[in-house]
């Protein structure tokens, strides 16, 4: 792979700590979610950050496919739901559901565009055959 961009973020304190990008743009406290034993859900957590990255990246890939196909699709929207759970071997794993809305086109065209985006999105390529990713497509 020819690297086009690299970023760097440092974490201290694990799930109950702090993350900061080298350029200082991203800097926030992270905490364990309540459902995993944390105090509350008032902070960001690793799953939330993963969901944000995947949603933004997938939406960019989708818009690239829309431009390439010269589709008449309207403004797209991607909602990423990221779950964490225990695996059979005692470790932990993630699962993702991407709810993707592609307005202004038929459902068939929307599904085709989403499948194309899923093939080029870096997050999709990184997760393929590693975690379950479910794509739910709407066109309203």
Which residues make up each language-model segment?
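Extended beta-strand/beta-hairpin segments
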Residues: 1-52, 59-140
């Amino acid at each position: 792979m020819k690297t086009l961009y690299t970023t760097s973020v440092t974490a201290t304190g694990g799930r109950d700590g702090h993350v900061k990008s080298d350029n200082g743009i991203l800097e926030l406290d992270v905490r364990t979610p309540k459902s995993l034993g944390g105090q509350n859900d008032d902070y960001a957590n690793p799953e939330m950050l993963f969901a944000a990255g995947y949603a933004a990246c997938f939406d960019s890939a989708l818009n690239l496919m829309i431009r390439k196909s010269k589709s008449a699709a309207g403004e797209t929207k991607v909602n990423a739901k990221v779950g964490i759970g225990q695996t059979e071997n005692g470790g932990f794993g993630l699962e993702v559901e991407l709810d993707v809305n592609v307005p202004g086109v038929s459902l068939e065209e929307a599904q085709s565009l989403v499948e194309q985006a899923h093939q080029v999105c870096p997050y999709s390529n990184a997760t393929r055959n590693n975690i379950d990713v479910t794509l739910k497509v709407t066109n309203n």
